[in-house]
Design a protein with these regions (language model features):
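N-terminal single-pass transmembrane signal-anchor helix
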Residues: 4-39, 49
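Internal low-complexity, small-residue/proline-rich segments
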Residues: 32-290
């Protein structure tokens, strides 16, 4: 006679559910870690490509577009000039041929997949998740002669949220600061740079906006500190906490930076201000500890 199959008891069912829950609990952090690593690797590649684009642009001792804090309508932004070297040559040629450019154009290489502030619906900002070192790129500097501290010791690009606390960062903008929509939630447009040492004047402000936090070098041997003591960069701030005067990273483990020699480093959240700002100056003469 065929025996009937014994049904699973309630206790056995609960045990199975508990085991599955434990396994899921063990797997989720691992999956999250894999995803975070993939995002970091993608962002690392983007930053490296941006620096290599600068090297290609600078062939023949060609000077970079000056980031001196002032507006020059006859020139394009640094990141616009790098477009042919970040897989955007067709778009660049169209702009040059027509004399016009579309500020709403999205450049994939300029966006970090980890940047939580990227807004796909914002079609007028030319968002950028990476910022060029304005302090090092003043006065039409040249790759071969403007970095006495060494290209391996000077930051070229740092991570930066594309939006933060009323401010949008744009690869298209040539100005340190402009006003787009006064009174709205994001009424300021800052070009995709950090460490701008120039105060910003705008017709909608009764007083000039303060400059970015930038390095001040003094002493013998030379040491650099931020123009506001103790500040370096922000680690995973909320949108409301974003300080447009500083760089930001979405990675808990530290901020990715591309050096002028093409290498990419991770700066720890607790980095000493003197070390960080010493890496921002191209000719400060500081001794940077590894």
């Amino acid at each position: 006679m065929r025996q009937s199959r014994r049904a699973m008891t309630l206790i056995e069912l609960l045990v199975v559910i508990a085991i599955i829950a434990v396994l899921i609990g063990l797997l989720l952090p691992a999956i999250a870690q894999v995803r975070a690593t993939a995002l970091r690797m993608s962002s690392t590649n983007n930053i490296r490509q941006c620096v290599l684009a600068m090297h290609n642009y600078a062939e023949g001792d060609r000077p970079f577009p000056s980031l001196d804090g002032f507006t020059n309508p006859s020139t394009n932004s640094l990141m616009f000039e790098l477009l042919p070297y970040v897989e955007e040559e067709n778009y660049y040629r169209q702009c040059v041929a027509s004399g016009k450019s579309n500020s709403a154009h999205t450049v994939k290489m300029y966006l970090s997949p980890a940047d939580p502030t990227v807004n796909p619906s914002d079609k007028g900002c030319s968002e950028a998740s990476y910022a060029a070192n304005a302090y090092a790129l003043r006065k039409k500097c040249r790759l071969g002669s403007s970095f006495p501290d060494g290209t391996s010791n000077t930051i070229a690009f740092a991570e930066h949220y594309s939006h933060g606390n009323r401010t949008q960062f744009s690869w298209y903008s040539t100005e340190a600061f402009t006003i787009s929509f006064p009174g709205s939630a994001s009424d300021r447009v800052h070009r995709a740079t950090f460490a701008e040492p120039v105060a910003v004047f705008a017709p909608f402000f009764a007083t000039p906006l303060p400059p970015d936090v930038f390095p001040i070098t003094s002493g013998d041997p030379p040491t650099s500190v931020g123009s506001e003591p103790g500040l370096t960069f922000q680690v995973r701030p909320t949108l409301a906490e974003c300080n447009y005067r500083l760089a930001q990273t979405p990675h808990a483990g530290g901020m990715l930076v591309g050096m002028f020699d093409g290498s990419v480093r991770t700066l720890a959240p607790g980095i000493a201000p003197s070390v960080y700002w010493g890496m921002v100056t191209p000719a400060g003469g500081e001794v940077i500890a590894d």
